[in-house]
């Protein structure tokens, strides 16, 4: 538990710095965050994911590069920090570790992300809240709505 709190605090500090760097110089900040992201993850999935992202974002003519640069420039700093923390730490680190642990100890296989159709009649607010709560218990921290 203390280890998770320490890792969480370190991730928040790192993300705060990275977001400030991206806001001040988006091109340089994007390169730095991807280079840094390749150092941090220990799992094969995370390393592969960040290698792909690095390759995509190294092409300044890429639509993804333009999108990320626009997000970095136009999205509120606090929202960008929260979003980055949720994807980077909660989903890729903490959640992935919990999914792996649950698979090893209970034989449960949980997805890394869940897509929710909010327009479907059976997916009312209470159902979605329950799904997210149950998903978090399994290590799922990324929801596509």
Q: For the regions a protein language model found, what residue spans apply to each?
A:
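Serine/threonine-rich low-complexity intrinsically disordered regions
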Residues: 4-7, 25, 102, 118-124
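Generic alpha-helical secondary structure signal
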Residues: 9, 28, 62-66, 78, ...
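N-terminal [4Fe-4S]-dependent radical SAM core
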Residues: 43-115, 137
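Well-ordered, non-membrane alpha-helical segments in soluble/globular domains
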Residues: 85-89, 124-131
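Core AdoMet radical
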Residues: 113-126, 135-145
């Amino acid at each position: 538990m203390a280890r998770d709190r320490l890792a969480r605090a370190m991730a928040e500090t790192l993300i705060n710095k990275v977001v400030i760097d991206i806001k001040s110089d988006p091109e340089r900040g994007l390169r730095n965050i991807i280079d840094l992201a390749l150092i941090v993850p220990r799992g094969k999935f995370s390393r592969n994911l960040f290698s792909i992202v690095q390759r995509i974002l190294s092409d300044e003519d890429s639509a993804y590069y333009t999108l990320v640069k626009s997000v970095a420039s136009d999205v509120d700093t606090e929202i960008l920090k929260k979003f980055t923390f949720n994807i980077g730490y909660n989903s890729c680190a903490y959640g992935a570790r919990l999914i792996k642990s649950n698979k090893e100890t209970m034989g449960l296989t949980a997805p890394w992300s869940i897509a929710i159709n909010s327009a479907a009649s059976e997916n009312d607010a209470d159902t979605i809240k329950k799904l997210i709560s149950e998903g978090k218990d399994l290590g799922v921290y990324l929801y596509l709505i």
